[in-house]
């Protein structure tokens, strides 16, 4: 057991494992007991951190709105206004339809994803070790059976949920602008078309297959891009932390670089969402 605890592979696996909760015939079960529970398993750390960071986002912007003034703004108000104007400019330049939903949606996505990514800069052992200490002292659990992933975007379930929301909005916008008939025509009459009715009917299955692949690949790529970059970043932090005293300068260099990564990934997720919704709202194929 001791040898297992100190191996690098077990250390990495422990840090990259979610805290799980599931329902069994015997009642609620946690972590390893949920190994065979399948789809109906809750990643409680992902849920807790993502909801908590979402509430922090709402609190920050609500506080800024309440304290805003028409006079000389303070530093906090200026900072919030810079973010709002930055997102607003990107929405105006990219989204060519008319919707009051897009700018607030883009702002929410950018800030929320950024805050979730930002958790990757917290030392990898700090909060998981604290959770293990609490589990061991307060609940008599083995600290190695206590899991906590503090970066929600390193969980494919979280990024998939975000991408699924974008996908639903894409389909909703397309149906709202083009109607159900127009949406079906877009899926079945493009990219191949013919003036011959019989040929066009024969082309429908091929068009439908290609358009469905193109449609589904958009949220799929959104989810995997965000997850892959943040998961790899977290893994590198763990590997750096395993090399001893030399980790400090390497941690600093990687953290500085990773600040760019987490910001860029939040920006890309926001921009691609705007682009996809703009494409869905366009009357032109």
Curated annotation (Swiss-Prot):
Cell wall biogenesis/degradation as UniProt keyword: no
Transmembrane segments: 41-61, 102-122, 164-184, 197-217, 226-246, 252-272
GO molecular function terms noted in the UniProt entry: proton-transporting ATP synthase activity, rotational mechanism
Gene Ontology CC annotations of this record: plasma membrane; proton-transporting ATP synthase complex
Keywords, in A-Z order: ATP synthesis, Cell inner membrane, Cell membrane, CF(0), Hydrogen ion transport, Ion transport, Membrane, Transmembrane, Transmembrane helix, Transport
Localisation per UniProt entry: Cell inner membrane
InterPro entries: ATP_syn_F0_a_bact/chloroplast, ATP_synth_F0_asu, ATP_synth_F0_asu_AS, F0_ATP_A_sf
Keyword flag Ion transport: yes
GO biological process terms, semicolon-separated: proton motive force-driven plasma membrane ATP synthesis
Primary location recorded for the protein, binned into one broad class: membrane
Membrane topology field: Multi-pass membrane protein
Protein family per UniProt: Belongs to the ATPase A chain family.
Purpose of the protein: Key component of the proton channel; it plays a direct role in the translocation of protons across the membrane.
PANTHER family the record matches: ATP SYNTHASE SUBUNIT A, CHLOROPLASTIC
Assembly mode: F-type ATPases have 2 components, CF(1) - the catalytic core - and CF(0) - the membrane proton channel. CF(1) has five subunits: alpha(3), beta(3), gamma(1), delta(1), epsilon(1). CF(0) has three main subunits: a(1), b(2) and c(9-12). The alpha and beta chains form an alternating ring which encloses part of the gamma chain. CF(1) is attached to CF(0) by a central stalk formed by the gamma and epsilon chains, while a peripheral stalk is formed by the delta and b chains.
Protein name as it appears in the record: ATP synthase subunit a
Gene: atpB
């Amino acid at each position: 057991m001791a040898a297992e605890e100190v191996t690098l592979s077990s250390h990495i696996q422990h840090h990259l494992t979610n805290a799980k909760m599931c329902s069994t015939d015997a009642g609620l079960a946690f972590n390893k007991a949920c190994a065979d529970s399948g789809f109906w398993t809750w990643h409680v750390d992902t849920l807790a951190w993502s909801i908590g960071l979402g509430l922090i986002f709402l609190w920050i912007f609500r506080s800024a709105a309440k304290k805003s003034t028409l006079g000389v703004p303070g530093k906090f108000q200026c900072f919030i206004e810079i973010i709002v104007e930055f997102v607003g400019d990107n929405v105006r330049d990219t989204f060519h339809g008319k919707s009051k939903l897009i700018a607030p949606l883009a702002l929410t996505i950018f800030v929320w994803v950024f805050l979730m990514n930002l958790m990757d800069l917290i030392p990898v052992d700090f909060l998981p070790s604290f959770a293990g200490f609490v589990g061991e002292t307060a609940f008599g659990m083995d600290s190695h059976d206590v899991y906590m992933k503090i970066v929600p975007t390193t969980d494919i379930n979280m990024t998939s949920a975000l991408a699924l929301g974008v996908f639903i909005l894409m389909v909703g916008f397309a149906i709202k602008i083009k109607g159900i008939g127009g949406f079906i025509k877009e899926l079945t009459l493009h990219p191949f078309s013919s003036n011959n009715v019989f040929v066009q009917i024969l082309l429908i299955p091929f068009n439908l297959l290609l358009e469905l692949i193109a449609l589904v690949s958009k949220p799929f790529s959104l989810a995997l891009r965000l997850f892959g970059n943040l998961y790899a970043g977290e893994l590198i932090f763990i590997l750096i932390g395993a090399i001893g005293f030399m980790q400090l300068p390497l941690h600093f260099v990687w953290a500085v670089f990773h600040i760019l990564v987490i910001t860029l990934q939040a920006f890309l997720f926001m921009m691609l969402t705007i682009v996809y919704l703009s494409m869905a709202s366009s009357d032109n194929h």
